[in-house]
């Protein structure tokens, strides 16, 4: 009998589960305390449950994390974990500490099927969607370790391996737990889903979860974005920006969208590109994150110079667009933006296509 992993259950699902066992719904609060606050996963040690309930839980459900294959550290506090789903598939996550916050960057898929040309994950191909349990296991592994070091996770971003909006059900259930005070208790502004532009899912997102939205933009016209972000061939910039406006109008609180823009030398970093970007985002509550390109094996791209990035940023800033340049961290352990690769049994055969 395959046991269900309780990490896949949000609060409502846990209520239904316990009622199905003939228990009162208050058991949900008790077990969430054990799992998410006390980091206790052994039912036999949950002594506010009767022996018969502990035995029943052991028969039908489990609490299983992922196996930590490797944990890398660098001097400025960045940590990268490599986690095994099975012998063929590994995922990666990154913890980035800053003065007033600690951000955990987690994965939503094994590999990625979107093939963005500047991204190491996209070059690996795709194997599978992660389950809610596999997503939440990442956060539990990190929080359990960081708590022992008196560090904290204040922000969670779906910016690791995979396209979150091609795994909606699991990602939204995970967001329920990230926001739930009985689990991780993060605010909606502290959880961010980053998409390359899966427009139908973007239109559904506001109906399902109130978390923040980031868009991997990287170009200011369809011709260039078709090349850099191939999903643009299916959903154009016009469609993408319409979906962004729907998201902004749906919230009861004032929102903005974070647009991510990787800086590629001689590709998308000219003054003309900056001016076109200003025009493109006119009328949208936007914040732009300029990302120096992080190199990986066999890439055709180089990063823009610091002077070019500064000039680009100044153009946006003087046109009233909030703009920041991401500090590159974790590059020496393959943990910088666009470098997460893990280990993927590629079902798309993209790695084969690149070799032949």
Curated annotation (Swiss-Prot):
<keyword id="KW-0411">Iron-sulfur</keyword>
<comment type="similarity">
    <text>Belongs to the radical SAM superfamily. RlmN family.</text>
</comment>
<dbReference type="GO" id="GO:0019843">
    <property type="term" value="F:rRNA binding"/>
</dbReference>
<dbReference type="InterPro" id="IPR007197">
    <property type="entry name" value="rSAM"/>
</dbReference>
<dbReference type="GO" id="GO:0000049">
    <property type="term" value="F:tRNA binding"/>
</dbReference>
<feature type="binding site">
    <location>
        <position position="119"/>
    </location>
    <ligand>
        <name>[4Fe-4S] cluster</name>
    </ligand>
</feature>
<dbReference type="GO" id="GO:0002935">
    <property type="term" value="F:tRNA (adenine(37)-C2)-methyltransferase activity"/>
</dbReference>
<dbReference type="Pfam" id="PF21016">
    <property type="entry name" value="RlmN_N"/>
</dbReference>
<feature type="domain" description="Radical SAM core">
    <location>
        <begin position="98"/>
        <end position="327"/>
    </location>
</feature>
<keyword id="KW-0004">4Fe-4S</keyword>
<dbReference type="InterPro" id="IPR013785">
    <property type="entry name" value="Aldolase_TIM"/>
</dbReference>
<protein>
    <recommendedName>
        <fullName>Dual-specificity RNA methyltransferase RlmN</fullName>
        <ecNumber>2.1.1.192</ecNumber>
    </recommendedName>
</protein>
<feature type="binding site">
    <location>
        <position position="116"/>
    </location>
    <ligand>
        <name>[4Fe-4S] cluster</name>
    </ligand>
</feature>
<keyword id="KW-0963">Cytoplasm</keyword>
<keyword id="KW-0819">tRNA processing</keyword>
<keyword id="KW-0489">Methyltransferase</keyword>
<feature type="binding site">
    <location>
        <position position="294"/>
    </location>
    <ligand>
        <name>S-adenosyl-L-methionine</name>
    </ligand>
</feature>
<dbReference type="GO" id="GO:0005737">
    <property type="term" value="C:cytoplasm"/>
</dbReference>
<dbReference type="InterPro" id="IPR027492">
    <property type="entry name" value="RNA_MTrfase_RlmN"/>
</dbReference>
<keyword id="KW-0808">Transferase</keyword>
<feature type="binding site">
    <location>
        <position position="194"/>
    </location>
    <ligand>
        <name>S-adenosyl-L-methionine</name>
    </ligand>
</feature>
<dbReference type="GO" id="GO:0030488">
    <property type="term" value="P:tRNA methylation"/>
</dbReference>
<feature type="active site" description="S-methylcysteine intermediate">
    <location>
        <position position="337"/>
    </location>
</feature>
<keyword id="KW-0408">Iron</keyword>
<feature type="binding site">
    <location>
        <begin position="162"/>
        <end position="163"/>
    </location>
    <ligand>
        <name>S-adenosyl-L-methionine</name>
    </ligand>
</feature>
<dbReference type="InterPro" id="IPR048641">
    <property type="entry name" value="RlmN_N"/>
</dbReference>
<keyword id="KW-1015">Disulfide bond</keyword>
<dbReference type="GO" id="GO:0070040">
    <property type="term" value="F:rRNA (adenine(2503)-C2-)-methyltransferase activity"/>
</dbReference>
<dbReference type="GO" id="GO:0051539">
    <property type="term" value="F:4 iron, 4 sulfur cluster binding"/>
</dbReference>
<feature type="binding site">
    <location>
        <begin position="216"/>
        <end position="218"/>
    </location>
    <ligand>
        <name>S-adenosyl-L-methionine</name>
    </ligand>
</feature>
<dbReference type="GO" id="GO:0070475">
    <property type="term" value="P:rRNA base methylation"/>
</dbReference>
<keyword id="KW-0698">rRNA processing</keyword>
<dbReference type="InterPro" id="IPR004383">
    <property type="entry name" value="rRNA_lsu_MTrfase_RlmN/Cfr"/>
</dbReference>
<dbReference type="GO" id="GO:0046872">
    <property type="term" value="F:metal ion binding"/>
</dbReference>
<feature type="active site" description="Proton acceptor">
    <location>
        <position position="92"/>
    </location>
</feature>
<feature type="disulfide bond" description="(transient)">
    <location>
        <begin position="105"/>
        <end position="337"/>
    </location>
</feature>
<comment type="function">
    <text>Specifically methylates position 2 of adenine 2503 in 23S rRNA and position 2 of adenine 37 in tRNAs. m2A2503 modification seems to play a crucial role in the proofreading step occurring at the peptidyl transferase center and thus would serve to optimize ribosomal fidelity.</text>
</comment>
<dbReference type="Pfam" id="PF04055">
    <property type="entry name" value="Radical_SAM"/>
</dbReference>
<keyword id="KW-0479">Metal-binding</keyword>
<feature type="binding site">
    <location>
        <position position="112"/>
    </location>
    <ligand>
        <name>[4Fe-4S] cluster</name>
    </ligand>
</feature>
<keyword id="KW-0949">S-adenosyl-L-methionine</keyword>
<dbReference type="InterPro" id="IPR040072">
    <property type="entry name" value="Methyltransferase_A"/>
</dbReference>
């Amino acid at each position: 009998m395959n046991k269900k992993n309780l990490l896949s259950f949000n609060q409502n699902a846990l209520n239904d589960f316990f009622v199905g066992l003939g228990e009162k719904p208050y058991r949900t609060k008790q077990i969430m305390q054990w799992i998410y606050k006390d980091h206790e996963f052994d039912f036999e040690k949950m002594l506010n449950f009767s022996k018969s309930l502990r035995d029943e839980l052991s028969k039908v459900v489990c609490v299983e994390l992922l196996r930590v294959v490797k944990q890398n550290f660098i001097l400025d506090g960045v940590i990268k974990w490599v986690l095994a789903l099975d012998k063929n598939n590994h995922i990666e996550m990154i913890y980035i500490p800053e003065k007033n916050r600690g951000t955990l960057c987690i994965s939503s898929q094994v590999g990625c099927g979107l093939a963005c040309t500047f991204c190491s994950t996209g070059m690996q191909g795709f194997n599978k969607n992660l389950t809610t349990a596999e997503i939440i296991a990442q956060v539990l592994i990190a929080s359990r370790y960081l708590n022992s070091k008196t560090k904290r996770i204040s922000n969670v971003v779906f910016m690791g391996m995979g396209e979150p909006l091609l795994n909606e059900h699991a990602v939204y259930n995970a967001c329920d737990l990230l926001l739930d005070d009985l689990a991780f208790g993060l605010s909606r502004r502290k959880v961010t889903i980053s998409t390359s532009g899966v427009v139908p899912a973007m239109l559904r997102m506001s109906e399902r979860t109130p978390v923040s939205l980031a868009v991997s933009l990287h170009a200011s016209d369809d011709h260039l974005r078709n090349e850099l972000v191939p999903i643009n061939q299916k959903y154009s910039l016009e469609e993408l920006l319409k979906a962004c406006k729907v998201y902004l109008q749906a919230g009861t609180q004032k929102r903005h969208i974070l647009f991510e823009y990787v800086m590629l030398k001689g590709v998308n970093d000219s003054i003309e590109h900056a001016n076109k970007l200003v025009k493109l985002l006119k009328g949208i509550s936007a914040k732009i994150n300029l990302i120096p390109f992080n190199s990986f094996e066999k890439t055709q791209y180089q990063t823009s110079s610091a002077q070019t990035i500064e000039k680009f940023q100044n153009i946006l800033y003087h046109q009233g667009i909030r703009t920041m340049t991401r500090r590159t961290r974790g590059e020496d352990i393959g943990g910088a933006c666009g470098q997460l690769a893990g280990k993927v049994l590629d079902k798309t055969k993209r790695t084969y296509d690149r070799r032949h």
